[in-house]
Protein backbone atom coordinates (compact mmCIF):
# COMPACT_ATOMS: atom_id res chain seq x y z
CA UNK A 1 0.00 0.00 0.00
CA UNK A 2 2.83 2.36 0.93
CA UNK A 3 4.50 1.59 -2.39
CA UNK A 4 1.32 2.52 -4.29
CA UNK A 5 1.01 5.77 -2.33
CA UNK A 6 4.65 6.57 -3.05
CA UNK A 7 4.22 5.94 -6.78
CA UNK A 8 1.08 8.08 -6.84
CA UNK A 9 2.94 10.86 -4.99
CA UNK A 10 5.84 10.76 -7.46
CA UNK A 11 3.50 10.85 -10.47
CA UNK A 12 1.56 13.75 -8.94
CA UNK A 13 4.81 15.60 -8.27
CA UNK A 14 6.01 15.13 -11.84
CA UNK A 15 2.67 16.30 -13.26
CA UNK A 16 2.66 19.33 -10.98
CA UNK A 17 6.25 20.09 -11.98
CA UNK A 18 5.33 20.11 -15.68
CA UNK A 19 2.26 22.23 -14.98
CA UNK A 20 4.23 24.69 -12.86
CA UNK A 21 7.05 24.92 -15.41
CA UNK A 22 4.55 25.60 -18.19
CA UNK A 23 2.89 28.35 -16.14
CA UNK A 24 6.27 29.94 -15.37
CA UNK A 25 7.28 29.85 -19.06
CA UNK A 26 3.98 31.40 -20.11
CA UNK A 27 4.44 34.15 -17.54
CA UNK A 28 8.01 34.83 -18.68
CA UNK A 29 6.98 34.84 -22.35
CA UNK A 30 4.13 37.25 -21.67
CA UNK A 31 6.63 39.76 -20.26
CA UNK A 32 9.09 39.33 -23.12
CA UNK A 33 9.25 42.64 -25.08
CA UNK A 34 8.77 40.67 -28.30
CA UNK A 35 5.56 39.07 -27.00
CA UNK A 36 4.36 42.46 -25.74
CA UNK A 37 5.04 43.92 -29.19
CA UNK A 38 3.11 41.12 -30.92
CA UNK A 39 0.10 41.60 -28.67
CA UNK A 40 0.18 45.36 -29.25
CA UNK A 41 0.27 45.16 -33.06
CA UNK A 42 -1.99 42.17 -33.72
CA UNK A 43 -5.08 44.33 -34.35
CA UNK A 44 -3.19 46.40 -36.94
CA UNK A 45 -2.69 43.29 -39.09
CA UNK A 46 -6.15 41.80 -38.65
CA UNK A 47 -8.31 41.37 -41.74
CA UNK A 48 -11.95 40.85 -40.83
CA UNK A 49 -13.95 38.13 -42.61
CA UNK A 50 -16.78 38.99 -44.99
CA UNK A 51 -20.01 37.05 -44.67
CA UNK A 52 -21.64 35.47 -47.71
CA UNK A 53 -24.60 37.29 -49.24
CA UNK A 54 -27.55 34.90 -49.47
CA UNK A 55 -30.74 35.63 -51.39
CA UNK A 56 -33.11 32.65 -51.27
CA UNK A 57 -31.29 29.95 -53.28
CA UNK A 58 -28.40 32.10 -54.56
CA UNK A 59 -25.17 33.11 -52.88
CA UNK A 60 -22.22 35.45 -53.26
CA UNK A 61 -19.49 33.64 -51.31
CA UNK A 62 -17.91 35.28 -48.29
CA UNK A 63 -14.22 35.76 -47.56
CA UNK A 64 -12.01 34.39 -44.83
CA UNK A 65 -10.30 36.91 -42.60
CA UNK A 66 -6.80 36.75 -41.10
CA UNK A 67 -5.35 37.34 -37.67
CA UNK A 68 -1.83 37.06 -36.32
CA UNK A 69 -1.05 33.73 -34.67
CA UNK A 70 0.72 35.15 -31.63
CA UNK A 71 2.32 31.92 -30.39
CA UNK A 72 3.61 30.75 -33.77
CA UNK A 73 4.85 34.24 -34.69
CA UNK A 74 6.67 34.45 -31.36
CA UNK A 75 8.32 31.06 -31.94
CA UNK A 76 9.38 32.22 -35.42
CA UNK A 77 11.00 35.44 -34.12
CA UNK A 78 12.28 34.60 -30.65
CA UNK A 79 15.67 33.30 -31.79
CA UNK A 80 16.55 36.74 -33.14
CA UNK A 81 14.69 38.44 -30.32
CA UNK A 82 13.31 41.22 -32.52
CA UNK A 83 10.01 41.90 -34.28
CA UNK A 84 10.09 41.20 -38.03
CA UNK A 85 6.96 41.92 -40.02
CA UNK A 86 7.90 39.41 -42.72
CA UNK A 87 8.00 36.63 -40.10
CA UNK A 88 4.42 37.10 -38.93
CA UNK A 89 2.37 33.92 -39.14
CA UNK A 90 -1.37 34.17 -39.65
CA UNK A 91 -4.40 32.00 -39.01
CA UNK A 92 -7.80 32.14 -40.68
CA UNK A 93 -10.89 33.84 -39.27
CA UNK A 94 -13.91 32.10 -40.78
CA UNK A 95 -17.04 34.11 -41.63
CA UNK A 96 -20.18 33.09 -39.77
CA UNK A 97 -21.94 32.64 -43.13
CA UNK A 98 -20.01 31.15 -46.03
CA UNK A 99 -20.29 28.85 -49.03
CA UNK A 100 -18.99 25.95 -46.90
CA UNK A 101 -22.26 25.82 -44.95
CA UNK A 102 -24.47 26.82 -47.91
CA UNK A 103 -23.39 24.42 -50.64
CA UNK A 104 -26.97 23.97 -51.81
CA UNK A 105 -27.04 27.52 -53.23
CA UNK A 106 -26.25 28.74 -56.74
CA UNK A 107 -23.12 30.91 -56.89
CA UNK A 108 -24.08 33.93 -59.01
CA UNK A 109 -21.20 36.31 -58.38
CA UNK A 110 -17.69 36.51 -56.97
CA UNK A 111 -16.85 38.34 -53.77
CA UNK A 112 -14.25 40.79 -55.06
CA UNK A 113 -14.81 44.37 -56.19
CA UNK A 114 -11.80 44.36 -58.50
CA UNK A 115 -11.77 40.82 -59.90
CA UNK A 116 -13.91 38.96 -62.43
CA UNK A 117 -13.94 35.39 -63.71
CA UNK A 118 -14.01 34.55 -67.41
CA UNK A 119 -15.42 31.15 -68.42
CA UNK A 120 -15.15 29.49 -71.83
CA UNK A 121 -16.75 26.20 -72.90
CA UNK A 122 -14.21 24.22 -74.91
CA UNK A 123 -15.40 23.22 -78.38
CA UNK A 124 -14.32 23.28 -82.02
CA UNK A 125 -15.08 27.02 -82.28
CA UNK A 126 -13.36 28.18 -79.11
CA UNK A 127 -10.36 25.89 -78.75
CA UNK A 128 -8.13 27.71 -81.24
CA UNK A 129 -8.25 30.98 -79.28
CA UNK A 130 -7.81 29.90 -75.67
CA UNK A 131 -4.89 27.47 -75.42
CA UNK A 132 -2.29 30.02 -74.36
CA UNK A 133 -4.46 32.35 -72.27
CA UNK A 134 -3.92 32.03 -68.53
CA UNK A 135 -6.34 32.74 -65.66
CA UNK A 136 -9.48 31.90 -67.62
CA UNK A 137 -11.68 28.97 -66.58
CA UNK A 138 -12.45 26.28 -69.14
CA UNK A 139 -15.32 23.80 -69.09
CA UNK A 140 -15.00 20.67 -71.21
CA UNK A 141 -17.79 18.43 -72.39
CA UNK A 142 -17.58 14.81 -71.32
CA UNK A 143 -16.39 13.68 -74.76
CA UNK A 144 -13.56 16.25 -74.72
CA UNK A 145 -12.12 15.23 -71.35
CA UNK A 146 -9.10 13.37 -72.64
CA UNK A 147 -5.48 13.13 -71.57
CA UNK A 148 -4.42 15.08 -74.65
CA UNK A 149 -6.82 17.99 -74.11
CA UNK A 150 -6.13 18.33 -70.40
CA UNK A 151 -2.36 18.31 -70.87
CA UNK A 152 -2.75 20.92 -73.63
CA UNK A 153 -4.86 23.17 -71.37
CA UNK A 154 -2.78 22.93 -68.19
CA UNK A 155 -2.37 26.72 -68.02
CA UNK A 156 -6.09 27.04 -67.28
CA UNK A 157 -8.42 25.91 -64.54
CA UNK A 158 -10.49 23.00 -65.89
CA UNK A 159 -13.92 21.59 -65.04
CA UNK A 160 -16.47 19.26 -66.59
CA UNK A 161 -19.51 20.60 -68.43
CA UNK A 162 -21.14 17.18 -68.32
CA UNK A 163 -22.90 16.24 -71.53
CA UNK A 164 -23.38 19.77 -72.88
CA UNK A 165 -24.62 20.98 -69.49
CA UNK A 166 -26.41 17.77 -68.51
CA UNK A 167 -24.87 16.31 -65.36
CA UNK A 168 -25.18 12.76 -64.07
CA UNK A 169 -23.40 11.00 -61.24
CA UNK A 170 -21.67 8.66 -63.68
CA UNK A 171 -20.34 11.52 -65.81
CA UNK A 172 -19.08 13.43 -62.77
CA UNK A 173 -17.41 10.35 -61.32
CA UNK A 174 -15.61 9.64 -64.59
CA UNK A 175 -14.67 13.21 -65.52
CA UNK A 176 -13.53 14.28 -62.06
CA UNK A 177 -11.15 11.33 -61.74
CA UNK A 178 -9.40 12.42 -64.95
CA UNK A 179 -9.40 16.15 -64.16
CA UNK A 180 -8.21 15.68 -60.60
CA UNK A 181 -5.40 13.41 -61.76
CA UNK A 182 -4.11 15.36 -64.76
CA UNK A 183 -4.99 19.04 -64.30
CA UNK A 184 -3.54 21.60 -61.90
CA UNK A 185 -6.82 22.02 -59.99
CA UNK A 186 -9.46 19.96 -58.25
CA UNK A 187 -12.79 19.71 -60.07
CA UNK A 188 -15.21 21.42 -57.70
CA UNK A 189 -17.57 23.61 -59.80
CA UNK A 190 -20.45 22.61 -62.06
CA UNK A 191 -21.69 25.16 -64.59
CA UNK A 192 -25.35 25.91 -65.34
CA UNK A 193 -26.86 28.65 -67.48
CA UNK A 194 -30.03 28.64 -65.39
CA UNK A 195 -31.31 27.11 -62.16
CA UNK A 196 -31.92 23.37 -62.15
CA UNK A 197 -32.52 21.68 -58.80
CA UNK A 198 -31.84 18.19 -60.20
CA UNK A 199 -28.35 19.10 -61.39
CA UNK A 200 -27.75 21.12 -58.23
CA UNK A 201 -28.43 18.03 -56.12
CA UNK A 202 -26.30 15.77 -58.33
CA UNK A 203 -23.36 18.18 -58.13
CA UNK A 204 -23.76 18.71 -54.38
CA UNK A 205 -23.82 14.95 -53.84
CA UNK A 206 -20.47 14.82 -55.63
CA UNK A 207 -19.06 17.53 -53.32
CA UNK A 208 -19.28 20.15 -56.06
CA UNK A 209 -20.68 23.67 -56.07
CA UNK A 210 -22.84 25.12 -58.84
CA UNK A 211 -22.05 28.35 -60.69
CA UNK A 212 -24.51 30.38 -62.76
CA UNK A 213 -22.76 33.18 -64.70
CA UNK A 214 -23.94 36.73 -64.13
CA UNK A 215 -23.09 37.61 -67.76
CA UNK A 216 -23.59 35.29 -70.73
CA UNK A 217 -22.67 36.40 -74.25
CA UNK A 218 -20.02 38.46 -75.99
CA UNK A 219 -18.41 41.88 -76.03
CA UNK A 220 -21.60 43.98 -75.92
CA UNK A 221 -23.10 42.05 -73.01
CA UNK A 222 -19.86 42.37 -71.09
CA UNK A 223 -19.54 46.07 -71.85
CA UNK A 224 -23.10 46.78 -70.67
CA UNK A 225 -23.09 44.63 -67.52
CA UNK A 226 -19.52 44.33 -66.22
CA UNK A 227 -19.10 44.88 -62.47
CA UNK A 228 -16.69 43.69 -59.81
CA UNK A 229 -17.25 40.02 -59.06
CA UNK A 230 -18.86 39.29 -62.44
CA UNK A 231 -18.78 35.67 -63.56
CA UNK A 232 -18.72 35.82 -67.36
CA UNK A 233 -19.53 32.97 -69.73
CA UNK A 234 -17.96 33.97 -73.05
CA UNK A 235 -19.76 32.25 -75.92
CA UNK A 236 -17.68 33.69 -78.77
CA UNK A 237 -13.89 33.72 -78.34
CA UNK A 238 -13.01 35.18 -81.74
CA UNK A 239 -12.30 38.55 -80.10
CA UNK A 240 -11.23 37.28 -76.68
CA UNK A 241 -8.05 39.39 -76.75
CA UNK A 242 -10.13 42.57 -77.17
CA UNK A 243 -12.49 41.49 -74.38
CA UNK A 244 -9.62 40.81 -71.99
CA UNK A 245 -8.09 44.21 -72.77
CA UNK A 246 -11.45 45.89 -72.16
CA UNK A 247 -11.91 44.13 -68.81
CA UNK A 248 -8.40 45.11 -67.73
CA UNK A 249 -8.91 48.70 -68.91
CA UNK A 250 -11.80 48.99 -66.45
CA UNK A 251 -9.48 48.10 -63.59
CA UNK A 252 -10.53 44.47 -63.21
CA UNK A 253 -8.21 41.48 -62.91
CA UNK A 254 -9.30 38.18 -64.44
CA UNK A 255 -9.00 35.29 -61.98
CA UNK A 256 -10.06 31.63 -62.05
CA UNK A 257 -13.24 30.65 -60.22
For each predicted feature, which ranges?
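Metal-dependent polysaccharide deacetylase catalytic core of the NodB/CE4 family, i.e.
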Residues: 116, 126-220, 226-231
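Short, glycine-rich nucleotide/cofactor-binding loops
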Residues: 121-125
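A short, well-structured beta->alpha microelement
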Residues: 102-107, 215-221
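Terminal accessory/targeting
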Residues: 1-118, 130-137, 227-257
Amino acid sequence: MKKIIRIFFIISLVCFSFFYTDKVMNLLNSKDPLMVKLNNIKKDYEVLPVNAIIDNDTIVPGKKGLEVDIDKSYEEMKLGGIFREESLIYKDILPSSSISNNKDKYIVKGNSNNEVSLIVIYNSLTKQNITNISNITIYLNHKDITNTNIKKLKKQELYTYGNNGVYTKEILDNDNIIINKLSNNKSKYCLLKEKNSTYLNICNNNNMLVVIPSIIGGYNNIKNNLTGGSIILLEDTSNIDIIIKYINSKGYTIVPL
